[in-house]
Amino acid sequence: MHKLRAEASGCYSWSNGPGERYVAHTHNFEKVLYCVDGSITFVLENEARRLDLKPGDRMVLPAGTVHSAIVGDSGCTCIEGHR
């Protein structure tokens, strides 16, 4: 979390169970996210690109990017912050 706090504000962690989904949406801020446990797949720009994140992976999502997500078979825990 210390590394994330050095590059973003409003840092927090969240977890989801296996197979949970987020519908397509956007944010008005840039999101910096690290996968801590499990796995999650982010689907960007209406299926144009997929990012499979596992522990240790980092993603920077620009403000306004349409994205959805699918949690992996073992669930996931991520930390994120905004800038």
Model-derived features: positions:
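A generic structural motif
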Residues: V43-E45, I70
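Short, conserved beta-strand element in jelly-roll/cupin
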Residues: T26-F42
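A generic "binding-loop/recognition-motif" signal
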Residues: P18, N28-F29, E47, T65-V66, ...
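Conserved short histidine dyad/triad with adjacent acidic residue
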Residues: G10-H27
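Short acidic-glycine-tyrosine-enriched beta hairpin
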Residues: E47-A63
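Ligand-binding loop in jelly-roll beta-barrel domains
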Residues: A63-R83
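Short loop/turn motifs at secondary-structure junctions and domain boundaries
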Residues: R5-A6, V23-H25, F42-V43
